[in-house]
Amino acid sequence: MYAATPETPFGSARSQPVITRSVSQRYNHPGQSNHHHLLHSLSFNHQNVLALPAAAREPPVDVKINDIAGNSIAGILYKWVNYGKGWRPRWFVLQDGVLSYYKIKGPDKIVVIHETEKGSRVIGEESTRMISRNKRHAATNNTNHQLRRKPFGEVHLKVSSIRESRSDDKRFSIFTGTKRLHLRAETREDREAWIEALQAVKDMFPRMSNCELMAPTNNLDISIEKLRLRLVEEGVSESAIQDCEQITRSEFSAIQSQLLLLKQKQWLLIDTLRQLETEKVDLENTVVDETQRQAGNGDSEETISESDDDNEQFDEAEEEMDTCDSLSSSSFKSIGSVFRTSSFSSDDDGLTNGFESENDDVDPSIKTIGFNYPHVKRRKKLPDPVEKEKSVSLWSMIKDNIGKDLTKVCLPVYFNEPLSSLQKCFEDLEYSYLLDQASEWGKRGNNLMRILNVAAFAVSGYASTEGRICKPFNPMLGETYEADYPDKGLRFFSEKVSHHPMIVACHCDGTGWKFWGDSNLKSKFWGRSIQLDPIGLLTLQFDDGEIVQWSKVTTSIYNLILGKLYCDHYGTMKIEGNGEYSCKLKFKEQSMIDRNPHQVQGIVEDKNGKTVARLFGKWDESIHYVMVDQGKVNESHLLWKRNKQPENPTKYNLTRFGITLNELTPGLKEKLPPTDSRLRPDQRYLEKGEYEMGNAEKLRLEQRQRQAREMQERGWKPKWFRKEKGSETYRYIGGYWEARDSGSWDDCPDIFGQVHQSIK
């Protein structure tokens, strides 16, 4: 793909943007020629839309990044690999807007000498000494070092951000959007030199403004003036000439607008392609490295190999919550062995209470709490589809929506699952028995076990998202959902309370506790991935008055263009309240080839900040805890384990619990208000596999939904929730279950039309 050149000894000459004359006048570096480099196919100096005579056009001056920032920067930096290897030296080269790195030890090492780095600026005394040592060695052995290996990894600075460590003046990190590179220089001065060089090159890639993207209008004036002179010579009347000028300017303006939109889309796609190129190189190098490792060492689990993404295991010490200090790797070796050898059993229904053989010391009466409710028979599978689903490319649907708000994008029902966002809120309460047990622990005076169970509940809500790649239905304004589950000892209710921004509020009455909250997702569409940042607070109140609050972590969906779609959750979750203990949970971000994804680690602290317990596990499997006694790690115990998946999984990968959420049990339809999600026609058609009818109804409801903003602007208010005074949080005002008992739905809006009456 790239041709090797004398200026690029690593054989990776890359395309570079061409910068206009004004930039070249600011940065004048004569003698630094790079004529062998490939020029970027897109020039910052765009051609005029209207053709001009050659004399009227000034040729652009091609200035490359190395002309501005000098020739390549090179030197040794220490890169964080993993907890087994720690910091390892790598030879880094900054050239053509790309930071590449190479191994300097082992069979894949490169040998750097003065001739191969001629013209490069070398940072660091250690780097200079290494070049000198290699030069003497090369002279003694008469070795040819011109053949260079491919880089072990690459980072494109245009799509990366640089961050300096606040706790260590030698460290910094580079975030590419998909991974983070943790680096450490030899001295503080070396770090400053690297940061300055990296930032200087990154500044060469400014985001193009609209005025830069649009063609210059002064050339248009010249062309129109020439057109006027020609028409005058032909004897055309003044009114006709003015009409021609107006038509020309109007057409030119329209073309400019179209060009602007096309260029913006083009640059977004270029960003995406650069990231894909980097990931391709990373994956190829990792596959080669793993193949060589397995060939030499077999499949031993004790061997720790480096992959380019292993640094994802390392968390910045200056982050808001860093469990690395309190959750040392040595302490987790013993915990991990217990975790791996634990024997998990489950009953025929795939339901467990999270306390098994390794928790025999727990009071048996606690184990049964949350499981002593009356049994209710519910469905175990979705209806068989009536129609065969069409194959539709997700990329073909989203490529025109790069940069847009996802909440405004209308997709066919093929990309939905037969649940609404209101029902998804209730799905987070699948393991509500943990709150029942937390309530009981508090009654018995054990507030530590209470906070541990609350933490396990906060994690358990993410278990159902594993393998779920379809989008839930966006509720209509005023849409509601009820869940009366006596078999779980709770009643749940939710309502869409705002259209823009899209906010869903919920309230749940459990056994000894109440739970409420609202959710507003802030979405970012990166072309190849979607990032969802939850905005809102979840509140849990026990009958004894203790209140606990937390917020959800970030969720991202990856591989929208290439590869298998998957979602990941990452960030820090703080669980705090007016009780004796608080908890901090760290959801670790998954790398592209992570061998142990979905990890969660956390600590429980008392009011004095002393760590009294630790948690670990995976959000899609189980959570364990260990008590901390004067710094000693005790035996681990199981808090929560995910229920078994259905015997016949659905195409949507719904859990056993999720399959029941949209069910119309006998006699339920007559009790529901006309706003309930179970009566939404497009969602019901999708569940039954009637895709054509589902698409038609979805389009009809989307058109109806466009009136929601006008309704909201006219002062529309939700029926069952109100904002708390002095707060943006919505609280349930009551009255729903009373109206349900009396069947008083006359004042409820018919948001779906009359179609729901025919749904069976």
From Swiss-Prot:
<keyword id="KW-0446">Lipid-binding</keyword>
<dbReference type="Pfam" id="PF15413">
    <property type="entry name" value="PH_11"/>
</dbReference>
<feature type="compositionally biased region" description="Acidic residues">
    <location>
        <begin position="299"/>
        <end position="323"/>
    </location>
</feature>
<keyword id="KW-0175">Coiled coil</keyword>
<dbReference type="InterPro" id="IPR000648">
    <property type="entry name" value="Oxysterol-bd"/>
</dbReference>
<comment type="function">
    <text>May be involved in the transport of sterols.</text>
</comment>
<dbReference type="GO" id="GO:0016020">
    <property type="term" value="C:membrane"/>
</dbReference>
<keyword id="KW-0813">Transport</keyword>
<dbReference type="InterPro" id="IPR001849">
    <property type="entry name" value="PH_domain"/>
</dbReference>
<dbReference type="GO" id="GO:0005829">
    <property type="term" value="C:cytosol"/>
</dbReference>
<dbReference type="GO" id="GO:0032934">
    <property type="term" value="F:sterol binding"/>
</dbReference>
<dbReference type="InterPro" id="IPR037239">
    <property type="entry name" value="OSBP_sf"/>
</dbReference>
<feature type="coiled-coil region">
    <location>
        <begin position="268"/>
        <end position="322"/>
    </location>
</feature>
<feature type="region of interest" description="Conserved">
    <location>
        <begin position="495"/>
        <end position="501"/>
    </location>
</feature>
<dbReference type="Pfam" id="PF01237">
    <property type="entry name" value="Oxysterol_BP"/>
</dbReference>
<dbReference type="GO" id="GO:0006869">
    <property type="term" value="P:lipid transport"/>
</dbReference>
<comment type="similarity">
    <text>Belongs to the OSBP family.</text>
</comment>
<feature type="region of interest" description="Disordered">
    <location>
        <begin position="287"/>
        <end position="329"/>
    </location>
</feature>
<protein>
    <recommendedName>
        <fullName>Oxysterol-binding protein-related protein 1A</fullName>
    </recommendedName>
</protein>
<keyword id="KW-0445">Lipid transport</keyword>
<dbReference type="InterPro" id="IPR011993">
    <property type="entry name" value="PH-like_dom_sf"/>
</dbReference>
<feature type="domain" description="PH">
    <location>
        <begin position="70"/>
        <end position="203"/>
    </location>
</feature>
